[in-house]
Swiss-Prot record:
Chain's gene name: CPH1
Sequence similarity: Belongs to the bacteriophage holin family. Cp-1 holin subfamily.
Classification via InterPro entries: Phage_holin_4_1
Transmembrane helix as UniProt keyword: yes
Membrane topology field: Multi-pass membrane protein
Name under which the protein is recorded: Holin
Origin species: Streptococcus phage Cp-1 (Bacteriophage Cp-1)
GO biological process: killing of cells of another organism
Pfam families: Phage_holin_4_1
Segments forming a coiled coil: none
Keywords in alphabetical order: Cytolysis, Host cell lysis by virus, Host membrane, Membrane, Transmembrane, Transmembrane helix, Viral release from host cell
Length: 134
């Protein structure tokens, strides 16, 4: 019975939508880091781990809630997770220069400042390494 529920949840639209949003968020996040030239393996690994754990967590919560016939709660949780991923995707696109809604301007400015600081820190480190800055 549990196996059938796991298959039912895996074939469901909710899991497919969540997977698509997670994949798109990961891709836009990678492209954002690549555009700003701040890619590093640790950040990418953290992103893969975070997205994978989010997907696995929701999948098993959905299986459990389907098992106890309370999937309505799971759908509410999924809407919250999907909104978080949609916001993250819009933030990634905005940092890359794509048009964004006005309500996201402050968040995007924070992200831009973060990446600018990372770039400045990298330049300082490079200058120190070359012996140009004392």
């Amino acid at each position: 019975m549990l196996y059938n529920i796991m298959l039912e949840v895996a074939k469901g639209d909710y899991i497919t939508i969540l997977f698509a949003l997670i994949l798109f968020d990961f891709i836009t996040g990678f492209l954002k880091a690549w555009k700003w030239k701040v890619t590093d393996s640790w950040t990418g690994l953290k992103g893969v781990i975070k997205h994978t754990l989010t997907f696995i967590f929701y999948y098993f919560v959905a299986v459990f809630l389907t098992y106890i016939h309370a999937m309505a709660v799971g759908q509410i949780l999924l809407v919250i997770i999907n909104l978080y991923y949609a916001l993250s995707i819009m933030e990634n696109l905005a940092v890359m220069g794509v048009f964004i809604p006005k309500f996201m301007t402050a968040r995007v400015q924070e992200e831009l400042q973060k990446y600018t600081a990372q770039l400045d820190a990298g330049k300082d480190l490079l200058e120190e390494f070359k012996g140009e800055k004392k």
